[in-house]
């Protein structure tokens, strides 16, 4: 896990969880709850169209649609500010349970045994 200072949203930290098999999952903490970049989760699970996966599987109350000056932003590897769709823990599980791929089970194990405990420990 790495921690990045979010320059657009002062005081907001982006936690990046790395896994050799699945890739990276970027997370922000809002009101003491983790919110995950939906695209990261969908890609880790093997969805070929992350927008469709989020639209089809994640309820509206479990996601925040990215909007400039309204929602948290993240900075990508090229230094560009982005306003992604964030999903909460319920949305995370919705994507996991919606996946028919075998690696969804391993991804769920990684998230529940490493990612979520680390978030709860470091906040």
Which residues make up each language-model segment?
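An anion-engaging/catalytic patch
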Residues: 1-123
């Amino acid at each position: 896990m790495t921690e990045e200072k979010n320059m657009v949203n002062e005081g907001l930290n982006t936690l990046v969880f790395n896994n050799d098999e699945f890739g990276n999952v970027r997370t922000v903490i809002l009101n003491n709850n983790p919110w995950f970049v939906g695209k990261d989760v969908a890609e880790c699970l093997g969805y070929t169209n992350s927008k469709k996966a989020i639209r089809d599987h994640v309820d509206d109350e479990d996601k925040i649609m990215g909007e400039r000056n309204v929602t948290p932003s993240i900075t990508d590897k090229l230094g560009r500010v982005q306003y992604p769709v964030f999903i909460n823990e319920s949305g995370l599980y919705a994507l996991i349970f919606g996946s028919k791929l075998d690696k969804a089970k391993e991804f769920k194990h990684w998230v529940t045994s490493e990612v979520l405990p680390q978030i709860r420990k470091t906040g």
